[in-house]
C-alpha cells in the first residue's frame, strides 16, 4: 500500500502537482489520485516515474510504496 500522506507531502515539498505527475505517468489526474489514495492499483513503472520526479531514492522506496495496513491488531 502507498503511504498516501507521505507521498502527498513529498509532492508539495518538491513543488509538484498531481496534474504534472499524471502527465509524466501517462494518466489523468483523477486516475493518479485514485492510485495514490490506494483506490486503484499502481504498477511498478508508474511508481518508478513518480520516484524519479520526486527525487525518491531507492532506499526510500519502501517508505512510500510498501506500507502495510494494520487494522484490528492486538499485541
Task: Show where each model-derived region lies.
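Short, charged recognition helix plus adjacent turn
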Residues: 9-10, 14-15, 60-75
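DNA major-groove recognition helix of helix-turn-helix/homeodomain DNA-binding modules
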Residues: 45-60
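DNA major-groove recognition helix of helix-turn-helix
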Residues: 36, 46, 65
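Recognition helix of helix-turn-helix/homeodomain-like DNA-binding domains
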Residues: 27-42
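A structural preference for long, well-packed, hydrophobic secondary-structure segments
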Residues: 14, 32-35, 56, 72
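Helix-turn-helix DNA-binding elements, focusing on the entry/boundary residues of the two helices
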Residues: 18, 29, 47
